[in-house]
Amino acid sequence: RWHAAWGVAAMSKAKQYLPGTFYEVTRRCVERAHKLTPNYASSRKYASSVEQLYKYATARYAARYGIEVIAVCVMSNHIHEVLFDRTGKISQFLQARNKMLADTVKVRYGLPSNVFDKPDGTYNRLEGTTAIADKIAYVMANPVEAGLVASPEEWPGMISAVEDLFGATTNVARPREYLAQNNKTNAPTVKFRIGAPKEAVELFGSVTEMAMQVASHLSKKIKAARRRHSGNFAGRQRVLATNPHSRAKTYEKFGGRVPRLTTAGDLATAKRLIAEMRAFRKAYRVALEAVKAGKRRVTFPAGTGKMHFAYGYPREVYVPLPAA
């Protein structure tokens, strides 16, 4: 049948993509390789820095898919981001953005294999001001928590700061790696924007309040990391000397659960979101079985991704469940 040939004959766990959602997104390099290292970013060995590659690819697709960047840290072998999805198209954005970024990185380092380990990475839905502020701080503190530098400001790669929540825009020139140097295909310059979306400002009351909460979480994380590493950090120069063909050697636990949502201790909200997720998966399973049975007029639940965007099936309008 057509649905088997097109990859919709079976379902693991359907993912729901709702407009107006905050996400923590993590994207790891295959086999923990340092393919995103800022290695020689300021030298003349490469035409573009990894930061430029990230910013161009992100700006290229963010406006198209309604994505706003709130915080980001590009580590040597993974990317941490906090994003706001205005249209429910985060999956499409990540697939397109990550493909362009991976292609440019491969050309930059002459890599023969894949750059990333999964098609679009893992998403963690953030609900509530505490969860959002904590994850933004986590992103900014990542190089310190990894024992690489003593402060976020020392990280030589792409990393955002608390001040960026007030909004910042930079012009990014088109990289020379991989991309067609054609103005119609790839704009010679794009605007990379980062900052708090108006929805976040409404949640926190003001950007200043949001920045204060993030700064508080960030300070605690940095102090804890410095105690844990006893003040011993690799340092900026060792980070810059990292070979893009090398891999991380530190122990990392595999096989753990990947969180799908974070409410930072708000149990009532967590129960509501879990109930919504279960209801969505049940409705999705029913709709998918109807498609497999040959029915043509099938409506999928709100937040359906692939079956709506790729195959054109209609989906319901999202209506939140009442609070418990």
Place the predicted regions along the sequence by residue.
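Short catalytic/metal-binding and nucleic-acid-binding patches
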Residues: 1-324
